[in-house]
Amino acid sequence: MPAISNLMRLTSLTITPHTPWNVDCQVAPFPPRWLAALRDAYHRRPEIKPDWSLPTRGLVELLTGLDPAIVNVSSNPASGRFIVALPPGADTTVLAAAVAAWATTEVTPEGCDTDWWALCQPCDLHFHTETINLLDYHVRPNGTAAGASQMFTLLPSFLAQHVVTAKLPLGGRARDWILGPPQRDGRRSAVLWPPERLESARAGDALVTAKITFHVETVPNHPLPHVHADLSTSRFPLMPVAYVPARGDGPPQATIWLHAPDGFLREHEPHTLLAAAAWRAFDRASRTRQWQWKPGLATTLAWLTHLPFPNPEKVFTDPAAAADEGKIRAYYLYSEGSKSLAGDIDDLDELAAIAAGEETGKARTLLHPANTGFVPKDHIEAHEQLAAALAPVGIGMLEPCERVGKRNQRKVKPAETPGQSYTLELWTQSALTREALLAALEQHHQLTPVPDPADPTVITFTGELNLRVILKDAGALGAGIDRPDGDRQPEATLLGAYANQVAQRIGQSPGPRAAILELEDGRYFSRIRKIDPKPALKKAFARTDRRLQCLRPAKLFTPPANPPKSARKKPPAPYPGTGFTVGSILRASAAINDALRQLGHLSTYETPDTLPDLEHIGIWLHRSGNTCIPIVIRLNPSGPATAYLASADGTPMPPLPYSDLPKALATGKGRIPGGKNQEGQVARFLTNALGVGHDTHDRVVFVRSSSFRTRGWDWLQDKHIYPDRLILPGIELDDATATPRVFSPQEWPGLRIVRVRERSGTDEVARGFAADHETTSVRISGLFQFSDRVFYSINPRSDQMQTPLGATKLDPDILSNFTRQAANPRPLEIYPVFLQPKDDPAAYATLASGLRRTYLHTEQATVFPAPLHLCELADEYL
């Protein structure tokens, strides 16, 4: 077995200090005459408000994709650097026509008295040469790198182009890449192209490819920008798509990639991909819902190009033909929950029924044969190849981070307070799931059942805790919510009405209880075309003083027809003492634990000897539209957990037991409505949570960075944060403003603040693997130190991550590996930013890392430390 490394390397790249990457670019401003006419025409539309900006998103995507010479288009037409192109520059005739088409379709879609084609003349676009340093940056007063705007808007495209031109090798051979669709935030991908075809008798044929996405990030108080290059997959079904689930209250939407092998406007132009949005909107002519292009890139491009443009309806009814025929190929970007036609794709009657939105009787879940994720070997190879290819321009690897403490450092074990008593209701539809839950209590939790002789629906379990279990019939509670024909109410309205119905049916609980409800998952309701009732059920149960946990139906164990013959591998067997699968019992146990967690069944633990006895405080800011919901949870080693919510008018609210938090949130408490007073109320609430001016006891506050990325507590942002120099919430730290009041640890005795930042959907934190992976195990876990105050915590590999380490997806000769699911623990950035004198930053980073694995309700390590994890879980009641 390979040794475990003590060195971790992040997969992001950095730049060599003061090494320029100068490129000569052609730069053009937006013609003032065009801009004045466009603004005037746009604001003459009655539905457009005076302060609304021009809808430039489609224009940015269109111009960037039409001419591969263009590397950036600003979303602000008033910018002096509106278009940036490579020499010898872009085709002004194409650009002028594109602006005219965009103005016609998006600025004045109903027509106006301006002839945009006559107004937008190529001679109005004036390009001039400008030398731009792509690696230009400076260092802020707090020591954090501040990249120039071109690092975020231009550099990713140049890096992606570098990969395409160099045919970046992977798997020991040069590969063909194409520029991915441009993105509004400046990110750009290099995509392996064409995609690979996978054949599957179960899921149908499909396409899959890998891509590397470039973006620039910073690390607090670190003087160099980091270049992230994230490896991921893109999947495209070839089976007819009958149904795409809606996300939110609007109609179903989808992303379609477009590729013109011979160019969108001119033959032999360099290849690039475009991404267009489609939605299933009501068609007045046919009186049915059909797939249509959303206003934006697709509608403008269809107006502009001379090539036959894809019909979005055909992209869904016959994806294989759309991806293989025509001058413009279209690829539906796979979305979980989509529904497919299981019959023959040549069945014209079936296809017509799908196009009309009718039930066909053959639709089933559309499973893509390819699974997401890559093994560590793939991430490391992409990282090493990029570092070698980009070294000539001054971009290379980061130095390894050293492990903090011992590799086998003792885990903080949670302890259970003995003698606790709870009431648990089991709402089941089948006797099978009910028996699985009772078996989990007896066999997995080692509790002793004692039936109530007076009531057959009540069973008391005794042991480490006392549990009164009440059996309930769920009936049709979990059957799903129907949407009547022609009903266009928002989904939120239907969920709200159903929550009221359920609350009325189940009635008020006589006291605080936990509940488990047998319920299918979201994919099931997508298949049967009903609305998933889970959000409504959570609120209805909470309002009646029940904390709800949902559980999918249990399964009996069935012996395999062909058991494994290996003597080293145990044959499959049911969970000991039961007839159920191991997975069913473990899922039932997890549901029990999480239901009890909501009743306040939380762990206690001893504070490490190196730290004082600390109160642990989590601060989280939820947002719902314009409404803010700040939540504070306090875990006191010597007392019960408490929660704090804000009031709508700013009046302080008394603390409430953690177990009462679900009911409070479900009944609408804790909301701060939008308006001029909102930011001040949020700031006062957060300041009170810190204990300013009245608390002196030892406490550590955990705060999530992304909760305050744009507002609420500017000091937590990378560009403002500074060790042990605290600035209160609610103060806008504009670079031009005077420095506000700064507080030192001596002024606030006992207070510590730890900021954490997760990888999240924006990939703000890079992945991390063993730096010396050639001689040690490539996977790594523990706490690693990046700088004096910045650490990275990596959880151990979970039991579900069983994909062999050698299952590469970057070898085109082994496509079967794409069918494997791969995942790797993601580093959590930990920054002990405000500490008391003589505190050791590593000790508080170690505490934060250990609190990711200190629970009674789950054996899985969580993304956040316990106080923040509990705050995050409250989201299900909002």
Model-derived regions: residue spans:
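Long, contiguous domain-sized segments
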Residues: 2-295, 318-319, 446-533, 539-878
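Long, charge-dense tracts
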Residues: 272-531
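Long, highly charged amphipathic alpha-helices
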Residues: 436-440, 536, 684
